Amino acid sequence: MDTPRPQLLDFQFHQNNDSFTLHFQQRLILTHSKDNPCLWIGSGIADIDMFRGNFSIKDKLQEKIALTDAIVSQSPDGWLIHFSRGSDISATLNISADDQGRLLLELQNDNLNHNRIWLRLAAQPEDHIYGCGEQFSYFDLRGKPFPLWTSEQGVGRNKQTYVTWQADCKENAGGDYYWTFFPQPTFVSTQKYYCHVDNSCYMNFDFSAPEYHELALWEDKATLRFECADTYISLLEKLTALLGRQPELPDWIYDGVTLGIQGGTEVCQKKLDTMRNAGVKVNGIWAQDWSGIRMTSFGKRVMWNWKWNSENYPQLDSRIKQWNQEGVQFLAYINPYVASDKDLCEEAAQHGYLAKDASGGDYLVEFGEFYGGVVDLTNPEAYAWFKEVIKKNMIELGCGGWMADFGEYLPTDTYLHNGVSAEIMHNAWPALWAKCNYEALEETGKLGEILFFMRAGSTGSQKYSTMMWAGDQNVDWSLDDGLASVVPAALSLAMTGHGLHHSDIGGYTTLFEMKRSKELLLRWCDFSAFTPMMRTHEGNRPGDNWQFDGDAETIAHFARMTTVFTTLKPYLKEAVALNAKSGLPVMRPLFLHYEDDAHTYTLKYQYLLGRDILVAPVHEEGRSDWTLYLPEDNWVHAWTGEAFRGGEVTVNAPIGKPPVFYRADSEWAALFASLKSI
């Protein structure tokens, strides 16, 4: 039984009486015995309640049974393991290699009434774990469970904070450390392997135990894929070969900031003129209210009827052409829902394009003092119709891009055209929404010219979402939901295969006592100058927040930092091209390039921008200096030219001079040195 088949030379399977071990390229993946089984199965009834994208999830667990007995046999492709407990409780595990040589584990409960799986993967106490999509509170996931379910990210996201308590009291919206728009059942271990689960059901990846990782799935089957590499860079190349990679960004992205403006054509023109006349480099105007405004108690929201509102934006079509001639793009907004009181929803309903309720009627979701229909993207005709809405109403208008928002709100009790349970489709929905946008660009020949950016994601978003943004941060300094949280979000996505990430400059969520300060906006601007894209947002209550044109000092700050950003254009373009070619992310954890430095594995608030720039954003209020860690190398402080060799260092960090270092040996060193004179 120990002899591997020719196509499984990287696998080592050893059986001893009623126990076995499975190694893959010298990594222990599974270990099983009667006393320590690797598999449990059971049955449960999901109790999932949604209110405005915030989910209460409970499992009415009926049984959970350890499968202690294992009978092993060889199959044409590898090994077959029949797990059981007694005569009528069993499951089958097929161990093989896929067509690319990856380890493939295919598990099926033999009784389909057993719709729960708990599989334990072997681990070492010293392992670090990264990934699971976009995680805002933790980068190293070891020591905690991470439920995987796409939803709103929460307001506060920390049950110990007052803001979270306030949001929970209002509409169960506070969230917790694991709430995310972009969960994905993919993780990377410091044993230099990745594990990806093909399923899209509700899952919980628990990394709490020292000797194993327990993966729980609310389904009767599971498919897992593993691949190993000698370096993390090579491992990410393999992971993105499986999941897909983002195309390169349009060239105009690197030419300045995208200004988030609302209020109409002339307001956009006036603010654009103000900023450009003061020397601000502007690449675009992003007007999310292009389709109209709906005022709610939450604040100013968009009218979800995806067509140009000529009352609010008169002569927008001709103005877009004018702005384009001046090197300024116009970006809009869309999401996969249609407001029930508008004509696009009526059109979709007439053609049967909306998801259904139990009685066969159109399922209308309450989105916050208004209702909307869910365009059923599993219906090929509805999918094609929505692509045409994008092509006709946005691309033909001349939009250079848009926010493709939402995707997390698919109710689990709706009925879909493809017949698959909405509970299973829920996590898959954001990638389906991304694919709809991607194909609209691909079919019009605009891929690489037009950019859409998303907050929600899942397996497949790596290929189909051209850019991610971090969603709705609070306009505050909190670690779990403020400026700081964007860095672990970007790094965890990087380790999940998506290498293009940015955030709303200044944050978004303006509730309770939170109001964006001038200092926060300027610090966020500093940080964003060292990301792949600079873009502002007014927030949900613009009048409460400090804005980019708040005073002359703020405008001058944007002029300087957009000059910094545009100066880095050739360097950023090269990093983005490498991401498209090999899956090496633009914003990188330090250990990708400093594997032997143990300290780099626990850093979550600093990153490498490309290979040669190290950034440690100031994320605390009132600071004038900052302490950070430099791995051993020849580093130069970007603003003073002072040389550093490595270790913990403290530097002056006034607003406008964030802690940024570059490698003295970089081929781009002369370009980086020029930042000092800006």
Curated annotation (Swiss-Prot):
EC main class here is hydrolase
- In this chain, a 6-sulfo-alpha-D-quinovosyldiacylglycerol is annotated as bound at 288, 301-302, 304, 537
Q: Read off the SUPFAM superfamilies from this record.
A: (Trans)glycosidases, Galactose mutarotase-like, Glycosyl hydrolase domain
| One Pfam family matching this protein | Gal_mutarotas_2
In the UniProt entry, which residues are flagged as the active site?
A: 405 (nucleophile), 408, 472 (proton donor)
**Entries under InterPro entries matching the protein:** Gal_mutarotase_sf_dom, Glyco_hydro_31_C, Glyco_hydro_31_N_dom, Glyco_hydro_31_TIM, Glyco_hydro_b, Glycoside_hydrolase_SF, Sulfoquinovosidase_GH31, YihQ_TIM-like
Give the result of residue 301 to A/E, as annotated. Answer: Loss of catalytic activity
User: What domain of life?
Assistant: Bacteria
Q: How is its activity regulated?
A: Is inactivated in vitro by the mechanism-based inactivator 5-fluoro-beta-L-idopyranosyl fluoride (5FIdoF) that yields a covalent glycosyl-enzyme complex with the active site nucleophile Asp-405.
The pH note for this entry is: Optimum pH is 6.
Does the keyword Hydrolase belong to this entry?
yes
Upregulation details from the record are:
Induced during growth with sulfoquinovose.
Q: What catalytic activity is recorded?
A: a 6-sulfo-alpha-D-quinovosyldiacylglycerol + H2O = 6-sulfo-alpha-D-quinovose + a 1,2-diacyl-sn-glycerol; 3-(6-sulfo-alpha-D-quinovosyl)glycerol + H2O = 6-sulfo-alpha-D-quinovose + glycerol
Sorted alphabetically, the keyword list is: Glycosidase, Hydrolase
Q: What EC number(s) would the UniProt record show?
A: 3.2.1.199
Is Hydrolase one of the keywords UniProt gives this record? yes
Q: Which Gene3D superfamilies match?
A: Glycosidases, glycosyl hydrolase (family 31), Golgi alpha-mannosidase II
Q: What does this protein do?
A: Catalyzes the hydrolysis of sulfoquinovosyl diacylglycerides (SQDG) to sulfoquinovose (SQ), which is then degraded by E.coli through the SQ Embden-Meyerhof-Parnas (SQ-EMP) sulfoglycolysis pathway as a source of carbon and sulfur. Therefore, is likely involved in the utilization of the sulfoquinovose headgroup found in ubiquitous plant sulfolipids. Is also able to hydrolyze simple sulfoquinovosides such as sulfoquinovosyl glycerol (SQGro).
Let me see what the UniProt entry remarks about domains: Structural analysis revealed the molecular coevolution of catalytically important amino acid pairs directly involved in substrate recognition, as well as structurally important pairs distal to the active site.
- To which protein family does this belong? Belongs to the glycosyl hydrolase 31 family.
Protein name, entry field? Sulfoquinovosidase
